[in-house]
Amino acid sequence: MWLPVYVPLLLVFGVSLSLPQGSLGTDSSSLRGVDADTEKRINVGKKHLQTLRNLETRCHDSLQALVVIDAGSSSTRTNVFLAKTRSCPNKGRSIDPDSIQLIGAGKRFAGLRVVLEEWLDTYAGKDWESRPVDARLLFQYVPQMHEGAKKLMQLLEEDTVAILDSQLNEKQKVQVKALGIPVMLCSTAGVRDFHEWYRDALFVLLRHLINNPSPAHGYKFFTNPFWTRPITGAEEGLFAFITLNHLSRRLGEDPARCMIDEYGVKQCRNDLAGVVEVGGASAQIVFPLQEGTVLPSSVRAVNLQRERLLPERYPSADVVSVSFMQLGMASSAGLFLKELCSNDEFLQGGICSNPCLFKGFQQSCSAGEVEVRPDGSASVNEDVRKNRLKPLATYCSVNNPEISFKVTNEMQCRENSIDPTKPLAERMKIENCSIIKGTGNFDKCVSQVESILVAPKLPLPANIEAASSGFESVDQVFRFASSTAPMIVTGGGMLAAINTLKDHRLLRSDFSGDVEELAEAAREFCSSEVIIRTDGPVIQLPNARGEQKLNSLNFDLCKTMALTVSLLRHMAAGENQPSFIKWEKSIAGPDGKPLADLGWQVGVILHHVLFTEEWGRNAYEAGYSHNL
């Protein structure tokens, strides 16, 4: 490019060729001899240029979708969130954490454990759980594992697209498609104890499939090894903890929580709440510690900033986070039956008397899933995969290196009446037991839940992670550490137990965790008898308190009530007690509508997006285009 010879001369003499930024040209006072219409058009042009100049320097907001796929113990399910992003010149793009909202939850599809077990059934052969398998030989069948993963991902992708298409308007779709859609697929306790290389291989395949979506719908899904992976029990609990405190506005950069100390250092207090989350296969307990708390040397606290769960700009907090396998609703039910009905105190003449079941209820002696029929009889599913002892019995195998090479792990299995040397069917079987009958003795139910699940002599099997954090059982958690922070209990079964007692006016509507009040209410409820009506079986409550239909969801609700009583007693026995305890499914926003369900899903999003520079590199600099 060349310039006329007079241009340098103009520059030498300080003549500027650029227009002044404020006025964009000569001001109106110099426009002598110009008529009013011309001057008006000049001003319109100047204003138009100024508007465009402002657009170049201001921040721009747009919407982005985020997908969290919950690969839980019983199913795999998509959760689609929408968030506001802001892009500023020279600063990059970031997500407003307060804007994150759930716009749709998808259908439930097969769990990852089912995908792996079906693949092993086919290529390792039936009864692979009962004999040695050379895992190295199975590498030749990775392409077939890929096909199984592809079938699942196609269902999840179609379901996600259906949610996006139905929940977004056309303008929002344009923005969402342009930015790309980060996907976080995390497995929890369902495959946490799966041994060999199979689980990690499945995740390599899942990430590849997410990064290569169908081009037909126009949505650009993408992920990476940080976002799509198995998460530990402690992580699951910490993400649930972050979710709770974010949604309830306890977590934030609020200046009112901060002060400058005598040394000129900024100190921020936290007003965080703890959470007890009970899922299908595991339970998580997480709570913040008071400043100055002294823990035994064997107990490991987690600092949210040091462990990079939250950025430094958030108030610092040390928390206890522990996860127990075999304490979820399904897994604990299987283990509890196995132990209870192997005890001579409760097993007489082939009949197991279960104090946690209603009087008049009976079923065959198995840990299989139960269906309560209209005639009041209970049908037990004989499918091996529907047996609630299956995951534990698979883990407790002499063919699992965690058992064969670690004597303490084998002892834990044997302590729970599972012989690792026996075939899978025998490991799941309850010896010498044919029928289980309910007795409705709640106090005895509590004592058995306490001794089998909450305070066992040896750690429950597959709890290496919990033991490594310093806790071998739930009772030890509140003995070694405690907190005055509020505690929120969540999980479908735990909520159902409390809400059922409230519905029958056995608990006050504002019940806040008084353990003796709960024990008295549950004692009355669980002494009910099963009565067969023309429209099906009901629980006849004493003292004319009414009836409750008996079904597959509430027939063993008293065990959950007993677990809750035991948990509350241990909380109350700690050095510090929670300021209050609540049972919640979700947190409502200012409009009274739920922002999102409690659980780990929102927490895992926040864990990534709050580190704005790292998120910017992964989600925007690399983003979907990284996979092109």
Swiss-Prot record:
GO terms for molecular function: nucleoside diphosphate phosphatase activity; ribonucleoside triphosphate phosphatase activity. Pfam families: GDA1_CD39. InterPro entries: GDA1_CD39_NTPase, NTPase_alveloata. One of its GO terms (cellular component) is symbiont-containing vacuole. Its EC number is 3.6.1.15. It catalyses: a ribonucleoside 5'-triphosphate + H2O = a ribonucleoside 5'-diphosphate + phosphate + H(+). The keyword Transferase does not apply. GO terms for biological process: nucleoside diphosphate catabolic process. Glycans are attached at N432. May perform an important processing step in the conversion of high energy nucleotides prior to uptake by the parasite and may contribute to intracellular survival and virulence. NTPAse-I has a specific activity 4.5-fold higher than NTPAse-II in hydrolysis of ATP. The primary difference between these isozymes lies in their ability to hydrolyze nucleoside triphosphate versus diphosphate substrates. While NTPAse-II hydrolyzes ATP to ADP and ADP to AMP at almost the same rate, NTPAse-I hydrolyzes ADP to AMP at a much slower rate (0.7% of the rate for ATP). Homotetramer. Belongs to the GDA1/CD39 NTPase family. This is Nucleoside-triphosphatase 1. It comes from Toxoplasma gondii. The lineage of its organism: Eukaryota, Sar, Alveolata, Apicomplexa, Conoidasida.
